[in-house]
Amino acid sequence: MIARLTGMLAHKSPDAIIIDVNGVGYRVQIPFSTYYELPDEGKTVSLSIYTHVKEDAISLFGFRTVAEKEFFQVLISVSGIGPKMARDILSNIQPDELAGAILQGNLVRLSSIPGIGKKTAERLVLELKEKVRKMDVAPSTKEAAPSEAPPEVADDVASALVNLGYKEAVVRKVLAEMAIESGASTEAVLRQALKILMK
């Protein structure tokens, strides 16, 4: 069972990266919050890994922080939530804000996450409130500050957001209305687009 990978960051995209470890490339799925913290391609990266084993496949999920990995493992303990949905949840909300929403029973905030309906939000609160209370995560409702982004990253951002469950027409409309500055990063576009989409 792989618990951590350290190697060269051979490739990165908003939802997955490839880590080269002694000539072997490992594809690791990641949440946006981990993507924001990645070094440039060619640099060394080290991630905590959750290994998901199925009959026909092994999938790796990587996290920069222990809190993210712990929350991921707690999320997949909820009935109806698999690894991909758990990853997508953490792409849309920081662990501290998620903890706050669960502890406060904030169904409106939880159900605003793509793929999470009212019933799933209720299950999150019902099944995780006590677990979250015991976790070492300070609840918060703080939101990340928005940034502006260049048009050349729009396709990557749109693809990532569609994979998270947003409708492409809505995503494209939001991206078209965002102010454009050359030199802004993909991470900045994702942050701003998510902030607008979750209003």
Swiss-Prot record:
Cytoplasm in keyword set = yes
Q: Where is this region: Flexible linker?
A: 144-154
One function term, GO molecular function aspect: four-way junction helicase activity
| Principal location class | cytoplasm
Q: What's in the keyword line of the UniProt record?
A: Cytoplasm, DNA damage, DNA recombination, DNA repair, DNA-binding
Span list, region Domain I: 1-64
Show the Pfam families listed in the entry: HHH_5, RuvA_C, RuvA_N
The record's section on InterPro entries has: DNA_helicase_Holl-junc_RuvA_I, Hlx-hairpin-Hlx_DNA-bd_motif, NA-bd_OB-fold, RuvA, RuvA_2-like, RuvA_C, RuvA_C_sf
Task: From the Swiss-Prot or TrEMBL record, state where the protein is found.
Answer: Cytoplasm
Q: How does it assemble?
A: Homotetramer. Forms an RuvA(8)-RuvB(12)-Holliday junction (HJ) complex. HJ DNA is sandwiched between 2 RuvA tetramers; dsDNA enters through RuvA and exits via RuvB. An RuvB hexamer assembles on each DNA strand where it exits the tetramer. Each RuvB hexamer is contacted by two RuvA subunits (via domain III) on 2 adjacent RuvB subunits; this complex drives branch migration. In the full resolvosome a probable DNA-RuvA(4)-RuvB(12)-RuvC(2) complex forms which resolves the HJ.
Role description: The RuvA-RuvB-RuvC complex processes Holliday junction (HJ) DNA during genetic recombination and DNA repair, while the RuvA-RuvB complex plays an important role in the rescue of blocked DNA replication forks via replication fork reversal (RFR). RuvA specifically binds to HJ cruciform DNA, conferring on it an open structure. The RuvB hexamer acts as an ATP-dependent pump, pulling dsDNA into and through the RuvAB complex. HJ branch migration allows RuvC to scan DNA until it finds its consensus sequence, where it cleaves and resolves the cruciform DNA.
Q: Which HAMAP family match?
A: DNA_HJ_migration_RuvA
Tell me which family the UniProt entry assigns to this protein. Belongs to the RuvA family.
Name of the molecule in the record? Holliday junction branch migration complex subunit RuvA
- What lineage is this protein's organism placed in? Bacteria, Pseudomonadati, Thermodesulfobacteriota, Desulfuromonadia, Geobacterales
